[in-house]
Amino acid sequence: MTKQDRRPEILVCNDDGIEGEGIHVLAASMKKLGNVTVVAPAEPHSGMSHAMTLGVPLRIKEFRRNNRFFGHTVSGTPVDCIKVALSHIMPVKPDLIVSGINYGSNTATSTIYSGTVAAALEGAIQGVTSIAFSLTTYEHADFTYAGKFARKLARKVLQKGLPADTILSANIPNVPESDIAGVVITRQGRSRWSEDAIERNDMYGNPYYWLNGTLRLQDSEMDKDEYAVRRNFVTITPLSFDLTNRDFLGTLEQWKLQQ
């Protein structure tokens, strides 16, 4: 059987944990395209970025939903899940990795913190075509259109492929399909978090802190992800794990640090 004749093998992961609604919607959507394997963190790991577990053993367990096998949990980060899935759970290399659907957008500087995006980037590092999906809300989430769009984009990526070391990050407004303004290709924006550490005291009088913040819009162009998604556009941003600032290379060479 040739690759064209068989159903694609699709690995599904997230950072909200295996009980998050988004991963169940995404897995169901992907089953219409291929054979699905779900490997996700046992607990929520939002904001873990590209962290991986060292010095502590990882535990893998089967997860059942409604008395039916759904996937495997890993006692680690989203990146751990990708590594373990590729090395020990999946018998063959997947044709596609999809991560999400995340609670909350992953645009602008949020991209750097995102475990959802990191799982997809780890897939690219391992040579697997990968996509990250995020929904722009933390509450009252409606994944109906997001699941539908995820399938549409995944089908196109399976057909067209992606350049090496490149993923797609799709951010989807939490609105009915009728309110979607369109789909735009964007760059990662420059909006940044305005953060605060809220201090409280435990029962012994010792201080502890909750991190709290708001993403402040600093872009005003439709080709920036956060600006566009706030206007009900689905945004698709190509990303890479190569963080080199090429614009600065020439200037840095002029410093003549080798002398």
Swiss-Prot record:
Cofactors demanded by this protein: a divalent metal cation
Enzyme Commission number(s): 3.1.3.5
One Gene Ontology molecular-function label: 5'-nucleotidase activity
InterPro entries reported in the protein's UniProt record: SurE, SurE-like_Pase/nucleotidase, SurE-like_sf
Catalysis performed (reactions): a ribonucleoside 5'-phosphate + H2O = a ribonucleoside + phosphate
Pfam families: SurE (PF01975)
Keyword line: Cytoplasm, Hydrolase, Metal-binding, Nucleotide-binding
SUPFAM superfamilies referenced in this protein's UniProt entry, alphabetically: SurE-like
Primary location group: cytoplasm
Co-factor binding comment: Binds 1 divalent metal cation per subunit.
Binding site for a divalent metal cation: D15, D16, S46, N102
GO CC terms, sorted: cytoplasm
Source superkingdom: Bacteria
Compartment(s) where it occurs, according to its Swiss-Prot or TrEMBL record: Cytoplasm
Disulfides per UniProt: none
Class of enzymatic activity (EC top level): hydrolase
Family designation: Belongs to the SurE nucleotidase family.
Function description: Nucleotidase that shows phosphatase activity on nucleoside 5'-monophosphates.
Identification of the protein by name: 5'-nucleotidase SurE
UniProt gene name: surE
